[in-house]
Design a protein with these regions (language model features):
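Conserved non-transmembrane functional hotspots
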Residues: 1-144
């Protein structure tokens, strides 16, 4: 059996994770002092990725039930990293906070993706009748 809402959440989560990975790649490049040149293309990619995250994060987190838990951390990352050059100029303390916030968001998204994939796998083995029967049997008769 397939759950349309579950599939929607997984697609949304996959897009978020991909954007956070792209942002991480660009931040990592910016922090590598051995790479002296920041190209206009890298700045464009950074700005585009950051803009996508700014536009989609609140909606995605709300749909996934993570808004209260992750929105502050996500905004901290997006506000600290305004450009590749800007990331390069952060102090060591700011870099540690940026990395910690990014890691917190990314870890939670990855954990949720694993949980949703596990739920999808368990649903794949159920028929429509057994799924609805299990829901009815789990329902609290006093909760109406």
């Amino acid at each position: 059996m397939r759950d349309k809402n579950l599939e929607k959440q997984l697609r949304l989560l996959t897009l978020q994770i991909d954007s956070w990975k792209k942002l991480h790649d660009l931040i990592t490049y910016a922090l590598d002092k051995a790479k002296p040149i920041v190209s206009a293309e890298q700045e464009r990619q950074f700005t585009e990725t950051r803009a996508n995250l700014l536009q989609e994060t609140e909606h995605a987190f709300r749909e996934l039930g993570l808004l209260g838990e992750l929105s502050g951390r996500a905004m901290n990352v997006l506000q600290r990293g305004v450009s590749v050059r800007g990331v390069r100029e952060l102090t060591n303390d700011e870099i540690r906070r940026l990395e910690a916030d990014w890691n917190g968001v990314f870890t939670k998204l990855g954990l949720m993706q694993g949980q949703l994939k596990s739920r999808r796998k368990s649903l794949a083995g159920q028929s429509m009748v057994s799924y609805h029967l299990a829901r009815v049997l789990r329902r609290d008769p006093l909760a109406a």
